Amino acid sequence: MSIRSVLRSRIRASVASASLALFTSASLIAPIHSLTAQEKAGAASKQEAKESDYYAIHSFEVPEGVELEATSFQRMPDGKMAVASRRGEIWLIENPDSDKASAEQFKRFAHGMHEPLGMDYRDGWLYVTQRPDVSRIRDNDGDGQADEFEVVADGWQITGDYHEYAFGSKFDKDGNIWVVLCLTGSFGSDALYRGWAVRATADGKTLPTTSGIRSPGGIGMNAAGDVFYTDNQGPWNGTCALKHLMPKKFVGHPGGFKWYEQAASEMGAKPKEPKDGSRFMVEADKIPEYEPPAILFPYGKMGQSAAGIACDTSDGKFGPFKNQMFVGDQTFSTVMRCSMEKVQGHYQGACYPFREGLDCGVVGLQMEPNGKLFVGGTNRGWGSRGTKSFCVQRLDWTGKVPFEILEMKAIKGGFELVFTQPVDRASAEDISSYAMKSFTYIYQGAYGSPEVDATEPQIKSAKLSSDALRVELQIEGLQRGHVHHLMSKGIRSAVQTSSQEKGESPGQGGSQGQGRGLLHTDAYYTLNYLP
């Protein structure tokens, strides 16, 4: 080794020794930082809470060469699941509740339909809502193929415009199928009852029922049997929304008002036209027939194209969300969750994120009594976060209860939050655990609206109930007609018992101390009416 190499080695060793000494002396002077309880809770929350821990996605394998753009589902008497496609076909899935994923499960039942967007089964017939009518079909010879097709009701018209979809409900308690009919394009109605909801009766009548429809994405019922549909951002719709359908009501878009003369016997006189550029609750106070949106879905936050509707009537087989509604979004490829209540006789409520990561844009949803949520989708003609062209999937509850805001309810001077699991008292009663913003949308004939009239209501107090499942928030500055965005990033659960982790009795137990953060910290309440 040369003298130069020896010198280099000695210099490196000296530098390393000095660095070690400096580190050691610094450690003696400054002890290692000890995490506070709040920091520990924050660190823990980053490691847990994935949606897939609670709701697993099961994907079906569609036969090769088949583009099954699933729009609606219906259980058949033999246990098979009928699934309709935008491409005019109806397929049957064998053993739809199993973990099996094989193309052999699928068999085509019918074809030649015109974009079917709703199905139900009654008295040996599969009823199908398609673009021009409600039809019923059946297999008479038992070969697994539909061979009899009958038109039940067709009292509306079509022009060929691609917007003119027809979404059909299940049978209501009176035996009617509700059909929501898209306008001709976004702004007008060039064919009879376009921009209306109608009811197809068992004896073949078409009853004009509700005006003001723009561009529906789905239709369904809540646990009480009341009918709702989703409408999408556009003229007279600042953002996407969930709306309550009732006879003789108007739900927002005046583009179909020209048909009141034909509907006079069912609907009465035409309502007053809304003022362009107003706010929707200002107009609701002026127009008795106008029923404002029950829930507004903030555009770009909760989705961009609200679609299919399902209600959890499984009595706990889908987790803690009994009787709540679920709404798909085509653009975001997600399923949202909704809780509603009646205030002054009107439905209103909150929406929450629920499950993302579906294969393509969600269109069809169906909740089964066994707690299986079937999901279908497409992205043909529209973009979606999910990259596949179509999908047939199912959401299964894993048996674990997520720590979530179960409900956000309006109370005098604020909101009550109900949780799925007991909440840590210190975080629940610390007002810094919460923040709130409010905003609304312009009610206008132009396409959509930005968020406007923004405010920041102030949370003045937070009180936890004795069972640790409810928090009462008193808030200054609530705004009628606004979406109230609640952010609860500081909330922590009480330390959980093993039984609660398995989904048993979420209201029981719960020792002192902090557990996990909320799976989803955001809730959006549409405050139309004050209690």
Residue ranges and their predicted role:
Residues 413-417, 471:
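Structural beta-strand segments of beta-rich domains
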